[in-house]
């Protein structure tokens, strides 16, 4: 969705040892199927879900049967298309915030279960109601809904940015999604880049 951190998400995944690629929101269904991903991450972005002409995915993610992680705008997008509610915040939240895990979730490794952690926020909209059947898993200093999930369908949403170094345990959260939830194998290294270019 055009976040300044999008490439950083891909980098974090590759650091784990898993191949990842960045594609635009308007990728065609045909191109999407050709990639055949094991999971997708919906990035943040500068747009607002509350606008009438907001940025949307061309692919209907509600029909996908693979794990989904929404970050920032990606979280708000999931809330919106599944029938939740997103509202404009009175003040933009940017910078450090305290996030508290209030429900267990596969996206949060056991070592951080129930903890309060420092996270990095960058958003002006907020989810005020989660969709039916989804459950709130975390809250922050300025929001009662900072993460939610639909565990049985492997759909997860985070308002904060786990990909930036300012978020404590961010790499662990991304790894939990990639390895434990998407079941990806660590088969990619920088040597793959050299082999592809040669």
What is the predicted role of each segment?
Residues 1-42, 46-52, 56, 62-64, ...:
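RNA-binding accessory domains that recognize and position tRNA/RNA substrates
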Residues 70, 74, 79:
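Gly/Ala-rich beta-loop-alpha elbow adjacent to hydrolase catalytic centers
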């Amino acid at each position: 969705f055009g976040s300044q951190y999008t490439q950083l998400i891909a980098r974090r995944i590759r650091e784990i040892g898993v191949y990842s690629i960045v594609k635009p929101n308007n990728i065609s269904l045909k191109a999407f199927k050709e990639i055949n991903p094991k999971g997708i991450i919906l990035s943040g972005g500068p747009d607002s879900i509350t606008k009438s002409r907001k940025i949307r995915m061309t692919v209907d993610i509600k029909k996908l049967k693979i794990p989904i992680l929404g970050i920032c705008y990606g979280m708000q997008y999931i809330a919106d298309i599944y029938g939740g509610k997103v509202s404009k915040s009175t003040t933009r939240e940017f910078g450090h915030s305290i996030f508290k895990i209030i429900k267990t979730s596969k996206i949060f490794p056991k070592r951080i279960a129930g903890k309060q952690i420092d996270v990095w926020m960058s958003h002006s909209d907020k989810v005020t109601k989660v969709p039916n059947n989804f459950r709130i898993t975390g809250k922050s200093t300025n929001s009662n809904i900072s993460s939610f999930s639909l565990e049985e369908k492997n759909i997860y949403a985070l308002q904060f940015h786990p990909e930036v170094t300012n978020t404590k345990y961010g790499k662990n959260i991304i790894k939990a999604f990639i390895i434990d939830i998407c079941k990806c194998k660590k088969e990619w290294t920088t040597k793959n880049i050299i082999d592809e270019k040669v």
